[in-house]
């Protein structure tokens, strides 16, 4: 594999349209206050010592800024940024090719690091700790191990499934950072910053209307903002996005007052109709969705906002969830 795996992933950022809206510097990053405070210390210390920063593990629900933070760390350290993804690394040789092509102090970002297979993880162990690769050459009695030195680097791993990372790999990250859902006020700032970047007028009520339906997630906030902007340009050509206009556009997009879309509501209604604990496999079958997708994208916010509860016997609708479905006339 030369750098094909590396370049293949870099050509597919999580959302091309978000690239221009991403903050480039740590001072521009909105939210995750405690994480940012600590990162400033770690970045500045490593930069002043002219040493690679310790390896970083970013974990939390999708869309909270893990990839953006990885870019920012490299930018602040003034080093090259290289990226790939766990599913793209099928052989130990794929990872070895990337590591041997790094420059000193580079940042290597591995998205979905929980999807690395164990053989590749073992290659990472010596690379992370000793900046070397142990390569087995030959087979059987003639097999021998070659030790290849690689440049000192910083590995940044990102995952939405922290529990799926093996303990040996997890323990080799000196800086584990958990990203939390955003508050409405923080999402308002994210939306206003994006509006300024793409020269779209939006007032406080419009930004707050979108933010309140974004499930605590910047990626969703930016996606909804772009769609509301589309409606504005289609219907008025110019003007300001206010609360009423944003509400109307979001209604047309099928986003309700709590930020739930049709799939969220289908999930909640199914759990309600089950009249008791229901297993994730049963839910996935009923919704025709992958179990992993439900656990990664649908459930985290529903659990965070106490609409559903996980129990040893399955998922249960909470009183809050029941009252919401009832008051919104979904049941």
Swiss-Prot record:
Its main location: cytoplasm. One of its GO terms (molecular function) is ATP hydrolysis activity. GO terms for biological process: DNA recombination; DNA repair. Keywords: ATP-binding, Cytoplasm, DNA damage, DNA recombination, DNA repair, DNA-binding, Hydrolase, Nucleotide-binding. Residues 257-331 are annotated as: Head domain (RuvB-H). The RuvA-RuvB-RuvC complex processes Holliday junction (HJ) DNA during genetic recombination and DNA repair, while the RuvA-RuvB complex plays an important role in the rescue of blocked DNA replication forks via replication fork reversal (RFR). RuvA specifically binds to HJ cruciform DNA, conferring on it an open structure. The RuvB hexamer acts as an ATP-dependent pump, pulling dsDNA into and through the RuvAB complex. RuvB forms 2 homohexamers on either side of HJ DNA bound by 1 or 2 RuvA tetramers; 4 subunits per hexamer contact DNA at a time. Has 3 domains, the large (RuvB-L) and small ATPase (RuvB-S) domains and the C-terminal head (RuvB-H) domain. The head domain binds DNA, while the ATPase domains jointly bind ATP, ADP or are empty depending on the state of the subunit in the translocation cycle. During a single DNA translocation step the structure of each domain remains the same, but their relative positions change. This is Holliday junction branch migration complex subunit RuvB. It comes from Anaplasma marginale (strain Florida).
């Amino acid at each position: 594999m030369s750098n094909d795996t590396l370049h293949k992933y870099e050509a597919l950022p999580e959302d091309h349209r978000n690239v221009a809206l991403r903050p480039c510097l740590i001072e521009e990053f909105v939210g995750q206050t405690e994480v940012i405070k600590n990162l400033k210390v770690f970045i500045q210390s490593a930069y002043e010592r002219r040493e690679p920063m310790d390896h970083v593990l970013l974990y939390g629900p999708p869309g909270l800024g893990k990839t953006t933070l990885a870019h920012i760390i490299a930018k602040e350290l003034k080093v090259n940024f290289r990226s790939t993804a766990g599913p793209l690394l099928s052989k130990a040789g794929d990872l070895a090719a990337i590591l041997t092509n790094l420059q000193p102090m580079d940042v290597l970002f591995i998205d979905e690091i929980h999807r690395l297979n164990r053989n590749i993880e073992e290659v990472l162990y010596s690379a992370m700790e000793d900046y070397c690769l142990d390569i087995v050459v030959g087979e059987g009695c003639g097999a021998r191990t070659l030790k290849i030195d690689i440049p000192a680097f910083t590995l940044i791993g990102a995952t939405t499934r922290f529990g799926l990372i093996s303990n040996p790999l997890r323990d080799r990250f000196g800086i584990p950072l958990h990203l939390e859902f955003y508050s409405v006020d923080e999402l308002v700032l994210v939306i206003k910053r994006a509006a300024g970047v793409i020269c779209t007028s939006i007032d406080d009520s419009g930004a707050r209307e979108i933010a309140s339906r974004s499930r605590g997630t910047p990626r969703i906030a930016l996606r909804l903002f772009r769609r509301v902007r589309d409606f504005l340009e289609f219907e008025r050509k110019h003007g300001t996005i206010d609360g009423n206009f944003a509400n109307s556009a979001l209604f047309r997009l099928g986003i309700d007052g709590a930020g739930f879309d049709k799939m969220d509501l289908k999930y909640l209604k199914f759990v309600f109709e089950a009249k008791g604990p229901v297993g994730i496999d049963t839910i996935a079958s009923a919704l025709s969705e992958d179990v992993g997708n439900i656990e990664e994208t649908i459930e985290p916010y529903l659990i965070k906002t106490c609409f559903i509860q996980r129990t040893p016997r399955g998922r249960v609708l909470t009183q809050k969830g029941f009252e919401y479905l009832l008051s919104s006339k979904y049941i």
